[in-house]
Amino acid sequence: MSEEIITPVYCTGVSAQVQKQRARELGLGRHENAIKYLGQDYEQLRVRCLQSGTLFRDEAFPPVPQSLGYKDLGPNSSKTYGIKWKRPTELLSNPQFIVDGATRTDICQGALGDCWLLAAIASLTLNDTLLHRVVPHGQSFQNGYAGIFHFQLWQFGEWVDVVVDDLLPIKDGKLVFVHSAEGNEFWSALLEKAYAKVNGSYEALSGGSTSEGFEDFTGGVTEWYELRKAPSDLYQIILKALERGSLLGCSIDISSVLDMEAITFKKLVKGHAYSVTGAKQVNYRGQMVSLIRMRNPWGEVEWTGAWSDSSSEWNNVDPYERDQLRVKMEDGEFWMSFRDFMREFTRLEICNLTPDALKSRTIRKWNTTLYEGTWRRGSTAGGCRNYPATFWVNPQFKIRLDETDDPDDYGDRESGCSFVLALMQKHRRRERRFGRDMETIGFAVYEVPPELAGQPAVHLKRDFFLANASRARSEQFINLREVSTRFRLPPGEYVVVPSTFEPNKEGDFVLRFFSEKSAGTAELDDQIQANLPDEQVLSEEEIDENFKALFRQLAGEDMETSVKELRTILNRIISKHKDLRTKGFSLESCRSMVNLMDRDGNGKLGLVEFNILWNRIRNYLSIFRKFDLDKSGSMSAYEMRMAIESAGFKLNKKLYELIITRYSEPDLAVDFDNFVCCLVRLETMFRFFKTLDTDLDGVVTFDLFKWLQLTMFA
């Protein structure tokens, strides 16, 4: 069979955002209606290949060196020398997608440090319903084979259907990355390829937390337990989690890079992700012993301590029970006592498939809300609470807790409202090839004081955070994809502030909120409005004679200034203010000033118009100096936000992002001329809108001529 190369169509920028919003409104992104990743439709592509007698070749993730990686697995790396891309049908006469159902032994790690992902896949095989959500039925290398397969993954709040071809990296006739123990099953290798595709390359999968894989296969939320500080009923929590079908993983922390994947005396691997696949209590010499079953994704290197495959403890267990539990083959799976587990391992991750009864004994439906947000330099990336001058500009979200938990759950404890916050940064693995990795992220929770409770959604300002301490916060700021914490707080209103640790670190994020009882949530943002002064009415007689003489000297005998003359006048005046950092006013900015002030439409400013403009600029200069807090002659982007409000404008965070992009320098400084240009532009646009909004409903309708007139000449 020949190969058919099918190139996907990409949408970018505003077009992509509009399409995404429309898709959500149509219900796309839920598991039963997954979004076609990169617009690739599995059925359409498969049918096309079958009709043309060709095998699918995916140009969105082509079989080329760049798909392997960018550094350690980059095109010039010795590790990728000799790698070829082949289909399973070229390797075996009778390859299989899945044989007798997916099992944990189908997943053996190859030459890639993605044990965290493989541990998650291994846990996935314990639940057929979950597995077949991720690995759809009906795929094979026999009936209807066209070299194309598909998988469904949860990506930052949406389910996506990811198409891949079956060209896999091969070296010396063997799969380079994940493979099955028998060597003839390929579902796990193709799932790994789909995951590599959404993250940009195979190398992007190196190193991570099992919780990432858990969540991307389920859409669930992960809880972390540091085993040195674990609750006394952790074993019961594990049993309940396994009963619910939750996915569990664990690892041993390392103290230095040299410890990475070091093997302990009893054959445990440090810095390596294991999956927890079972838990059972057995009668051992008349006492009940709690056991836990683990699996190493390598498919080998197993625990050799008590309760390992060949240990003597099994001789003192009822033969029937022993045969049910005991694992004899070298497949990476083993039992150990829970006591040894607590002693040897450092961290446990439990991904709850739905946010039901987290750490609770009774299962009930939790309420869920998801928000998307961004951190942008100069506008919404304020850093953590250690940076009080900028912390307040971070995105803010309000939670209203009304109902307390049922008393059955907590006995005599003080009543409160339980909820989980989970902050996840987006697309960081995909951006590794550009030198960007996980940012250090976290969040703080503030109680809204009674005098501010119930007010409309207003972004809280710097003074609030200077005067109020956080009521709760994430357990730590850490450079993981997601930070999640469970809280119990009294009823009331709270504000959540997600942030990076340092200011000016850019990124996109998803904030998920899970509450046991009904709760109100909202994103806080200022409503767009302007407190514009009435347009000044002034006669020439009211203007000071000295100002008239100065204007005559600058403007000439016609007593009018053109755009060029205005630029000359303003730059001559502003150059005398040595304390200001400025490059001078541009023709474009002076044209905006003329458009704002020109009453008779001749494109020039007369004496009265110039006098009004000059008084306005003097007011802007006063505001500029007030908010140039360090007296550097320029404002920071964050200082500019306060200055704009002082000038009478309230804008939402999206507009601030646009303004900072347009009017700040690369170092995020805003000089005086750019500040004036921004305020003039804002006033012009607000006044245009006010003129057109005749019924004062905040909505205007443009025909094409009006739109062009507004955008081209405002």
From Swiss-Prot:
EF-hand domain mapped to chain residues: 541-576, 585-618, 615-650, 680-714
Location of the region described as Linker in the Swiss-Prot/TrEMBL record: 527-542
Regulation: Activated by micromolar concentrations of calcium and inhibited by calpastatin.
Modified residues annotated as Phosphothreonine in this record: 354
UniProt key word Zinc: no
Binding site for Ca(2+) 2: 316, 318, 323
Pfam families membership: Calpain_III (PF01067), EF-hand_8 (PF13833), Peptidase_C2 (PF00648)
List of residues binding Ca(2+) 4: 628, 630, 632, 634, 639
CC cofactor note: Binds 4 Ca(2+) ions.
GO molecular function, one term: peptidase activity
Post-translational modification: Undergoes calcium-induced successive autoproteolytic cleavages that generate a membrane-bound 78 kDa active form and an intracellular 75 kDa active form. Calpastatin reduces with high efficiency the transition from 78 kDa to 75 kDa calpain forms.
Subcellular location: Cytoplasm; Cell membrane
Catalytic reactions on record: Broad endopeptidase specificity
Keyword annotations of the record: Autocatalytic cleavage, Calcium, Cell membrane, Cytoplasm, Hydrolase, Membrane, Metal-binding, Phosphoprotein, Protease, Repeat, Thiol protease
Binding site for Ca(2+) 1: 109, 114
Cellular component, GO annotation: cytosol; plasma membrane
GO biological process: proteolysis; regulation of catalytic activity; self proteolysis
Coiled coil: none
Enzyme class name: hydrolase
Family, similarity comment: Belongs to the peptidase C2 family.
Functional description taken from the UniProt entry: Calcium-regulated non-lysosomal thiol-protease which catalyzes limited proteolysis of substrates involved in cytoskeletal remodeling and signal transduction. Proteolytically cleaves CTBP1. Cleaves and activates caspase-7 (CASP7).
Protein name (database record): Calpain-1 catalytic subunit
Gene source species: Pongo abelii
